Amino acid sequence: LNIFTNNLEGLVLDHRYYAGGCSPHYIVDTRFRKPYNVESYVPETTGKYEFTMTEYNSYSNYESFVLKAKAEQSGFSFGIKIPGVFELGYSSNDNRFQKFIQRMKRFSSTSSNFIHARSELAVGVYKLKPQSLMLHYEFQQRLQQLPVEYSYGEYRELYRDYGTHYITEATVGGIYEYTLVINSQELQKAGYSLSDVQKCAQYGFNIGANIYQVYGKLGITEAGCKSLLKEIGDSTSSKRFVEDFIVLVRGGASEHITALAYRDLPTAALLQEWGDAVQYNPEIIKLKAEPLFQLVTPRDLAQAAAIKENLQRALEEFQLESSSCHCAPCQGNGIPFLRGNKCECLCPLGYSGPACETSKRTDAAVNGNWGCWSSWSSCAGGERRRRRLCKNPGPETDAGSACSGPDAETLAC
């Protein structure tokens, strides 16, 4: 796993090695043999097809809490010791993520409101043994070929081919989420609030719920909820309140993902089918990870201490090199990302060109984006420090949103 891009890279562990053992496990009714490296696999049945909903009254708030959480885990500090469980973000190369971003970014300069809904289904948790792991033969050969005298270029190639971390524990399953883009002005004219839309959607989407039996408890009339839900659930209607309905799905067979993505309002039966498909086609949704250098032991390498130290040193350089902060800003609030060692822009709908420079729109305010972190300071008082500036680009005065996240970090030393 490349923790900076969310790309799954080459195999570092041999999951076809069984050490002569035969430990049968089951996924639903499918029997499989547990590999030597796996300590445990526990089936899960959590998730009830219920949606957790959150309101955002501006695009900048939505972007800070939803979009940037999906893009990349770029805030990890040097040492890259990731604490606890975190959600696997989307790679910028993921076609699902690209389409989602392109549709969402076109609302970056509007006064729209947003409702983000999410339903998570976990089907299993697997955990690796804490030590004595069997390395994949090709990865072990690459480690043995690394020079004892530090040469960043050769260590960088290892990280490019195999990623920066290996997954020690993972929750597999599926996530169905959608975003409602609401015309705040029309909503206000009709006397509705964003909370009214959320309440109607909450009851209307949850499996087994009948909105017309509970409308009295919502503080909104039956006619009001019918009007709002019709716009969400009918892609052919002329929509006054709902500007867009954007779906993003992980896990399940491709035909079910396609069906969900092209239906405005998924039915209970379709969600159940998707859930059944997730059992046999899950994706990693949460994980724990350790840096690759933790796999370097004297058991596998004669010069283990030197190689491990070199890998740690190279990881800091690789993190700086892998960041899109080196890229020039994209226009129209496009997102810069690295494809290999080349900067590219993911443009919002309505923008095109290498830097998203071609558009007929003139209303897009420029939002701020972080520049690169500075180098770590020398150790003083048991701490090292580094800073970054919101100038890549800086936010447009009185219109663009500022960068989210801290502008300084400290590290014990």
Feature roles, as predicted:
Residues F100-I101, C356-T358:
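A short, polar/proline- and glycine-enriched secondary-structure boundary/capping micro-motif
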Residues S238-F245, C327, L338-K342, P348-L349, ...:
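Thrombospondin type-1
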Residues L1-Q331, F337:
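Membrane-permeabilization and membrane-interfacing ectodomains
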